[in-house]
Amino acid sequence: MFSNQYIQQRIHKANSLREEGKNPYKNGLKRSLTNAAFLEKYAYVKDLEEPKDKEKCESIVGRVKLLRLMGKACFIKIEDESAILQAYVSQNELNDEFKSLKKHLEVGDIVLVKGFPFATKTGELSVHALEFHILSKTIVPLPEKFHGLSDIELRYRQRYLDLIVNPGVKDVFKKRSLIVSSVRKFFEMEGFLEVETPMMHPIPGGANARPFITYHNALEVERYLRIAPELYLKRLIVGGFEAVFEINRNFRNEGMDHSHNPEFTMIEFYWAYHTYEDLIELSKRLFDYLLKTLNLDSKIIYNDMEVDFNQTSVISYLDALETIGGISRGILEKEDRLLAYLLEQGVKVEPNLTYGKLLAEAFDHFVEHKLINPTFVTQYPIEISPLARRNDSNPNIADRFELFIAGKEIANGFSELNDPLDQLERFKNQVAEKEKGDEEAQYMDEDYVWALAHGMPPTAGQGIGIDRLVMLLTGAKSIKDVILFPAMRPVKNDFNVESGE
């Protein structure tokens, strides 16, 4: 694993430190300031002639990003999470330590420098070292600065290296953290209670998706990694909670692309005595809050598309197919005509699709990618909405919406189905679809129906994909860019890469 000649040279240097009685992985030394705090505290030191006060001693730590040896002195660029700070080490102050430094120190090593602030001839605020310690000897060379780490596969597989070499990557994940905490704060301010529900389910439910299957040794039963928390959250509404939310992982054993990862983060929230129209207004408030928190304008650019949050619209499913998709009502309202139209347009249609699923195929192909500004699409076909409430005026549609931004689904919400008999029938229909070969159809969940039979108040519920939300608000083009360790196809590891030195 460590046979590479450059790695062997570094291992030799680590062993050489040990021979000098120095631990190359020293512990217990503390910094007094972050690099950013040092730069702020001593910003007034701007001139080489500034009096040097050795009493103002600080300890800073970080990774060596640049090393310039110049005879009896050296300059070292040291990076911690907050900033890059320059250290100056001279043989005059550190005779033996300086000789050891010249012999052993390399780019990538993690160090501690204790010293006082001073400015170089060029006016750069730096640390004049009085003590120097290697805290962690790096035995694998980092990619050279000029070429960086551009191999996209390697960036995802070795995210730690990506974070070291590409500073902008840290910024994305700091923004992700801010987005998640802001979403949580928003719902707490709106009076919602954060809860946690099981990650392993006896019956997969809450979404149409293939589950991952595992085995519980103690119970001697199969369990499914959850595809959605919906049915458990609605059980809590039955139990008397009126506004709950959960931010956590879902797992779907399906394909991967730039906007899908089998393990992903969602927020789902349920609101008793409210309707899907209330959720639309709540969603608008959420985005207003996020844009303000992130200091973003109401117009953002994503994938070369201008998204204007001041141009939010609401449109029904059939109206969207007609006015945006360009399909006439005469075709949309007749199942045989719609099927013929899809085939004429070259859409690959699975055999025996229901009318509702044909409409969904048409929507996916002719509408979704055109929805750039925030668009709430309402009145979905009941056949593709097995958990949503049936509309009072038209039993063929559901009181449901999906929110699309920049051509992608961001949220799905509806007035919840709380009629246990209707829910039982719909589960039976889903089971029939599964028996016909639809692997994504939902399972029968009698326990959930039994819970509904105890009475669930009128409720609205919604899910928002956190990863896609982060993509939108950071401009990331791939979901892998906003997940620290995304799912990757297995490869044979070859760690003996050539050094960039």
UniProtKB/Swiss-Prot annotation:
E.C. no: 6.1.1.6
Entry GO terms, CC: cytosol
Keywords: Aminoacyl-tRNA synthetase, ATP-binding, Cytoplasm, Ligase, Magnesium, Metal-binding, Nucleotide-binding, Protein biosynthesis
Group of enzyme by EC: ligase
GO MF term set: ATP binding; lysine-tRNA ligase activity; magnesium ion binding; tRNA binding
SUPFAM superfamilies tied to this protein: Class II aaRS and biotin synthetases, Nucleic acid-binding proteins
CDD domains to which the protein is assigned, alphabetical: LysRS_core, LysRS_N
PROSITE patterns, per database record: AA_TRNA_LIGASE_II
Primary location recorded for the protein, binned into one broad class: cytoplasm
Coiled coil stretches, renumbered: none
Compartment(s): Cytoplasm
InterPro entries noted in UniProt: Aa-tRNA-synt_II, aa-tRNA-synth_II, aa-tRNA-synth_II/BPL/LPL, Lys-tRNA-ligase_II, Lys-tRNA-ligase_II_N, Lys-tRNA-synth_II_C, NA-bd_OB-fold, NA-bd_OB_tRNA
Binding site for Mg(2+) 2: 409
Residues that coordinate or bind Mg(2+) 1: 402, 409
GO BP annotations listed: lysyl-tRNA aminoacylation
Co-factor binding comment: Binds 3 Mg(2+) ions per subunit.
Cofactor(s) this protein cannot do without: Mg(2+)
Swiss-Prot/TrEMBL catalytic activity: tRNA(Lys) + L-lysine + ATP = L-lysyl-tRNA(Lys) + AMP + diphosphate
Homology family: Belongs to the class-II aminoacyl-tRNA synthetase family.
Assembly with partners or alone: Homodimer.
Family annotation (HAMAP family): Lys_tRNA_synth_class2
Record's protein name: Lysine--tRNA ligase
Taxonomy of the source species: Bacteria, Pseudomonadati, Campylobacterota, Epsilonproteobacteria, Campylobacterales
